[in-house]
Amino acid sequence: MAPEQREGKSQVSVTFEDVAVLFTRDEWKKLVPSQRSLYREVMLENYSNLASLGFPFTKPKMISVLQQGEEPWKSEKESHGCSPLGCHGSLQTTKSTQTKESLFQELKRKQLKRDEAWDFTSGKSCRPDNSFRTQDTNESLEIISINHTKILTIDKSRKNFKFGPSVGLKSIGKQKIAGEKTQRNSLEENSTLLSQPKLKTVEKRYKCSTCEKAFIHNSSLRKHLKNHTGERLFQCKDCLKAFSQSSALIQHQRTHTGEKPYICKECGKAFSHSASLCKHLRTHTLEKSYTCKECGKSFSRRSGLFLHQKIHARENPHKYNPGRKASTSLSGCQRIHSRKKTYLCNECGNTFKSSSSLRYHQRIHTGEKPFKCSECGRAFSQSASLIQHERIHTGEKPYRCSECGKGFTSISRLNRHRIIHTGEKFYNCNECGKALSSHSTLIIHERIHTGEKPCKCKVCGKAFRQSSALIQHQRMHTGERPYKCNECGKTFRCNSSLSNHQRTHTGEKPYRCQECGMSFGQSAALIQHRRIHTGEKPFKCNTCGKSFRQSSSLIAHQRIHTGEKPYECSACGKLFSQRSSLTNHYRIHIEEDALNIDLHE
């Protein structure tokens, strides 16, 4: 052996403990068999490689145990923190299991190699004075360093080394050892440890007694409980809107200031919420698997493709009819694999991307409604629905139409209202060809042709085409009138009736016909009026085939075939099939009463 090699080895004393990774009995129990096998393989190879360098040290007891195929802690008794290596000095450590497990993931990659030069100092510049030189000075060698942060002291016979919790065999990189060489600091490599997957799952110990949602931290549970109690301590000074969390208030204030602190590094687009930025970043990283058949443009989300297709619908409305589903270039099976949904509902088989979405959905089957209104006692399955409902009592309408100034309690209602001004209609009924502005409206409209009425009243058995009509009907049985006019105090069963009534005080007529300029106080009146210009008569009698512009006209006409006469005169008891006929009949009694008064006088 060359003198410079012997001199190099005399400068630094290396023992097996320097490169061994130790586990306590409890930590060893948490390793799965594949991890234990990998640990055994790496430790034996490290010992073999270290022994081949010719350093003088005794064979550790743990190596003998591993070579016999036994587990380190199988026959050992844990006593005062001793490791399976045997108590070669005092070992004190506060290193968490999670750190060791993170280290374990890179143990295989960072095992020792034969004929490698070593430096166990603190990461400073290494000047070996021509030591560690092999016969071929041009040979590339890989310098290995042990890097540490927190204190873990191992007392040795020759030296005291101070290490830390991120104990790891750090591969610094291949360098040419010739003359004067330096060692790079391995701190820059620590990010590889942090990026390793965590083996240990964190227990969610804090559980909500109302909805059973679990949280890791008690503070998160306290914030969540405010959704049930309705507590709102943080108020906006601009619009007086209150929030249960300070973070929600900060985000809300950005709607007033226009601040957008979250900027995309890819395209420079700015966002007011971090969640919006995260959602936007997917457009740069996700595979664009939804392709428009018209122009070939691709999108990462089906909703993006659907909105894009509306552009083609405006250009060629007769050719394009999106129908109920947006078309994509992928088959149904491929779409399932490209966007996995791992949470399955056992009741109906629907799948969801998150456990919270599954919990919300399951309340449909269980009927659970944990969020209750403190004003009227009405309960909801989601906190967002409760917040929107509370605006009925407070009168708050934060979403305002820029065209006519009308306010709404939710953004979805505002979007539906805007269609009145734009006239956009992208959904065509296959039966009558009627164009509708939303998919949900198309589904409800189609029930007119099919006669389907899935929403049934449990009290009287009456059925309705939509759930909102059922809710309004049920208030007839309960007597509930939650909508009150602030001008005259009159109450109503539905919000639309209140809105229509309030226009009698203001004289407002926001619905304007683009054909003749005539204005109306109600959207239904405008819709009926438009049929005069278009000649549309969508309501057809199944008995005689006669068509009508209004559903009320069809109902009145059908009484001719059925013979039903629901309107009775309170004076003489005569029956009529239409209200207008009863009104005309009343005039006979009024004229008779006036004649009798004149005769008596």
From Swiss-Prot:
One of its GO terms (biological process) is negative regulation of transcription by RNA polymerase II. A zinc finger (C2H2-type) spans 206-228, 234-256, 262-284, 290-312, 343-365, 371-393, 399-421, 427-449, 455-477, 483-505, 511-533, 539-561, 567-589. GO terms for cellular component: nucleus. It comes from the Eukaryota. Residues 14-85 form the KRAB domain. Pfam families: KRAB (PF01352), zf-C2H2 (PF00096). It is found in: Nucleus. Keywords: DNA-binding, Isopeptide bond, Metal-binding, Nucleus, Repeat, Transcription, Transcription regulation, Ubl conjugation, Zinc, Zinc-finger. PANTHER family: ZFP14 ZINC FINGER PROTEIN-RELATED, ZINC FINGER AND BTB DOMAIN-CONTAINING. Transcriptional repressor that binds DNA upon activation by RAS proteins signal transduction to initiate transcriptional silencing through the recruitment of additional DNA-binding proteins, multisubunit complexes and chromatin-modifying activities to establish a platform for DNMT1 recruitment. This is Zinc finger protein 354B. It comes from Mus musculus (Mouse). The gene is Znf354b.
